[in-house]
Design a protein with these regions (language model features):
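Conserved GNAT-fold acetyl-CoA-binding loop/helix
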Residues: 35-56
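Acyl-donor (CoA/ACP) binding surface of acyl/acetyltransferases
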Residues: 1-22, 26-33, 73-179
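Generic alpha-helical scaffold signal
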Residues: 17, 28, 45-49, 66
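A short helix-loop-beta-strand connector motif used in the catalytic cores of GNAT acetyltransferases and
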Residues: 43, 56-71
Length: 179
């Protein structure tokens, strides 16, 4: 697996700890939107030190094939993080994993999420030979539900009490992409 992929004027790139400031800007700018659908973060999450340590750990995990987070950049906006897509929960015997993604609030409804996830699916199915890729989505996240459906994900029902959000356990819809 490579650390950088280019397509249609875009780049998906793994970042190391030297990009902690840029990644922190991306997360901080989108904190309110991202926190609606993500589990609680540690108190020190929004610090350069925490982000740097996370990027270093994620880089090492990619080398082992356990996890990967790629950040989305556009040729038109060099240096600006537009989104991220990650894979995790890799089960090699079943050739399966889960996928997560997010787009900067300033670049939504432009097709970037679909483009980013589409290319990550190609990478996962061709390079990592994943057969089954799951996405768990909060029922109120209609944009995300529409995104996965447009890319051929199939609904498998509800994962009850799947993630603790804002102090309470929340159901999520489970979708699967079969290569």
């Amino acid at each position: 697996m490579k650390f950088e992929y280019t397509f249609e004027g875009m780049t998906l790139k793994v970042l190391d700890e030297t990009f902690a400031g840029k990644v922190l800007e991306f997360y901080s700018r989108n904190r309110e939107e991202f926190d609606r659908y993500e589990a609680a973060k540690p108190n020190n999450f929004y610090t350069t030190e925490y982000i740097a340590a996370t990027l270093k750990a994620e880089y090492a995990a990619l080398l082992k094939g356990e996890f990967g987070r790629f950040f989305l950049f556009s040729d038109d906006l060099p240096g600006e993080i537009l989104g991220s897509v990650s894979f995790f929960g890799v089960t090699s015997i079943n050739r399966s994993c889960r996928i997560g993604y997010k787009i900067d609030k300033n670049y939504r409804q432009l097709g970037l999420g679909s483009l980013m996830v589409k290319h990550m699916l190609e990478i996962l199915t061709h390079e990592k030979e994943m057969h089954r890729i799951e996405a768990y989505i909060h029922p109120q996240n209609i944009s995300s539900i529409n995104l996965v459906k447009s890319l051929g994900f199939i609904s498998e029902g509800t994962a009850y009490s799947y993630v603790k959000l804002n102090g309470s356990w929340q159901d999520h819809l489970r979708f699967v992409y079969i290569s």
